[in-house]
């Protein structure tokens, strides 16, 4: 799966910003606030909460769930297995390393497959791209970009071709750079919502 967008491939796992970014996500995913997360919590949020509120079809929800499971299993997570932040961070390091190798070889990545599944849900008009309004609906429902300003910042960061719409390739590139490598082109991806 080839992308027309380059991304920084060198990781910076010891950078305090990278660690803080993933701690923020860990805390966001820790639904019951016990300092540990499970794949159960993540799938519940993704399928029972987000997909339901976005009015995904049963087929879209199943496809999305399969992608969420594969992605977080890539981080070493499993149903019924609690992990604390240090294990979560180690899992992200393994996932990022594997994903970046795939990206460099133009092979499908888990983040792209998840992106394809989620775009199918976001793209209410079937255009193959998402609009700012479609992104704002997701940001509000998911809680990842709770303010209009944060949604707009994400949209601007991801609109690499300045078309006014986002395609899955643009979104994947920016998320890969943001979550995996601290690529400066992706800094501020979620506005003030995520460090």
UniProtKB/Swiss-Prot annotation:
Molecular-function GO terms, alphabetical: calcium ion binding
Entry's Gene Ontology BP terms: bioluminescence
Keyword Calcium: yes
Proregion span(s): 1-6
Residue ranges of coiled coil: none
Annotated ranges, domain EF-hand: 17-52, 53-88, 110-145, 146-181
CDD domains (UniProt xref): EFh
InterPro entries: Centrin_CML-like, EF-hand-dom_pair, EF_Hand_1_Ca_BS, EF_hand_dom
One Pfam family it belongs to: EF-hand_7
Binding-site residues for Ca(2+) 3, renumbered to this chain: 159, 161, 163, 165, 170
Domain of life of the source: Eukaryota
Keywords on record: Calcium, Luminescence, Metal-binding, Photoprotein, Repeat
Sequence positions that bind Ca(2+) 1: 30, 32, 34, 36, 41
Binding site for Ca(2+) 2: 123, 125, 127, 129, 134
Function, in words: Ca(2+)-dependent bioluminescence photoprotein. Displays an emission peak at 470 nm (blue light). Trace amounts of calcium ion trigger the intramolecular oxidation of the chromophore, coelenterazine into coelenteramide and CO(2) with the concomitant emission of light.
Family of this protein: Belongs to the aequorin family.
Protein name: Obelin
Classification of source organism: Eukaryota, Metazoa, Cnidaria, Hydrozoa, Hydroidolina
